[in-house]
Amino acid sequence: MKDDMDSKNMTITAQHDRSARPYHHGHALAGILGPAFVAAVAYVDPGNVAANITSGARYGYLLVWVLVLANCMSVLIQYQSAKLGIVTGKSLPEILGERLGDAGRFMFFMQAEVIAIATDLAEVIGGAISLKLLFGLPLFVGGCIIGAVSTVLLIFEKGATHRIFEKLIIGLLLVITFGFIAGLFIAPPNPKEVVAGLIPRFKGTDTVLMATSMLGATVMPHAIYLHSTLVNDHYAPGEAKPSIKKLLHGSKIDVAWALILAGSVNLALLILAANSLYGMTGTDTIEGAQRAIQHVLGPVIGTIFSIGLLASSLSSTSVGTYAGSEIMHGLLRIKAPMWACRVVTLVPALVVLWFANNPTEALIVGQVVLSVGIPFAIIPLMRYTHDRTLMGEYVDGPVKHVVNIAVAALIVALNVVLIVLTMLGKA
C-alpha cells in the first residue's frame, strides 16, 4: 500500500516538474531580456527622427532598403557588444582601461566624453523642441526640464533598482513607438510602394548622399560602450546568473526583438513622411516636420508625434548619461556621482539652447562629432571579440570575424564619407 502511494506521489511530482519546466524556461528567458531594449533607445533618438522624416519627405519610399540594411548591421554590432560583456564580465570601457596606458586611457576618455556631450546635445535639443511644440515653452526652459526629469530617471540605474530603470526606459520606448506610428493608422501607406522601396537603388547624387548619411549614422558609439555594461548591470549584486551559453542565447533574442522594434519605428517615420509629407518643404527640421504632420494629419496626430519626440528625448538622454558614467568608470576608474555626469553633458546643450538661433545646425555638428567617434568604439569591439585570451571558447570564428570586419569597415568608411560631405556642405 505504501509502495503504491510512493509510486503515485513520484508520478505526480514528475508530471508537475514536466509541466512547470516550459514556464521555468520561459521565465528564465524573460529574466534575461531588457539590456538591448535600453541600448535600442539610441536608435530612435531625435537625430534619427529628423533624418528619417527628411528622407521620406524628399525621396518617398526610395530609401526604405537603406533602413533595413542599417538595422541588420545594428543587430550584429549590438550583439557583439553584449557578447563581450557576458563572456568577460566586463564592459568595453573597462577592457580598454586595462589594456591602455595612462596617457592612452585619458586620451580615449576625452574623445568619448566629447561624443557623450554631442549625443546629449541632440537629445536635449529634441526634448526642448517637443516641449515648445506641446506647451509653448522657451527652448532653454524646456532643456532644463529635460535635464531635471532625466536625472530623476537615473536614480534607478544601479543595483537592486536597475530593473526598474530598464522598465521605465522600455515604457518610454513603447510611448515612442506609439507616438511615431500613430500617423500610419490615419493615413496607411500603399504596401506595393513600401515593398518597391526594398529594392536597392538610387536616383541622382542627392539620394546617394542621403543613403550615406543614414547608413553612416546607424551605430551610435555610446550604445556600443553601454550594451557591454548593461548585460552585467541587469543582475543585482549577489543575484544568481544563468550560464554564459544561456545568457548568449537570451541576448540574441533580446537584441533581435529590441532592434526590430527600433527599426520598425524608424521605418514607420520614413513611411509616414513618404506617404503624407512627400514633396513638402520645411521638413528638414524637427519643428518643421511636426508642423507638416499636424497640417496634413490633424492636431491630434501632431500632438501624439510631439509626445513621442518627448519620450525619445527623455529616454535617450538618460541612456546617454548612463553611458558617459560607465565610460568614465571603465577608463579612468573613477565612479563619479550620476548627477555630476549629468551636469557635464547637460551644460553644453543648455548653452547652445540659450545662444543658438537655429538649434538644427547644432544637431548637424553633433552628428559629425558622433561620426568621428564611431571607429574608436567599433574597432576595439571587433578586435576584442576575436581575442581568444579574452573570449576563450566563445571567440569569434574566422567566418564570423570576416563578416564583422566587413560590416565594421563599411560603417567606418561611411562615417568618414559623411564627415567629409558635411564639411564640404553637401550632406
Regions found by a protein language model. Give the residues of each.
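Flexible loop linkers connecting adjacent transmembrane helices
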Residues: 11-18, 51-56, 79-104, 156-164, ...
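Extracellular loop-to-transmembrane helix junctions
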Residues: 27, 54-79, 93-97, 104, ...
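Juxtamembrane transmembrane-helix boundary signature
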Residues: 39, 66-99, 108-114, 153, ...
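Transmembrane helix-loop boundary segments of multi-pass membrane transporters
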Residues: 53-54, 58, 96, 126-140, ...
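Helix-loop-helix module between adjacent transmembrane segments
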Residues: 73-81, 103-123, 131-157, 216-217, ...
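Extracellular/periplasmic helix-exit of transmembrane alpha-helices
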Residues: 74-87, 231-235, 240, 260-288
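Transmembrane alpha-helical segments of multi-pass small-molecule transport proteins
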Residues: 107-113, 134-156, 174-179, 335-351, ...
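Hydrophobic alpha-helical segments and their helix-loop junctions in multi-pass secondary transporters
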Residues: 154, 173-199, 211-228, 381-389, ...
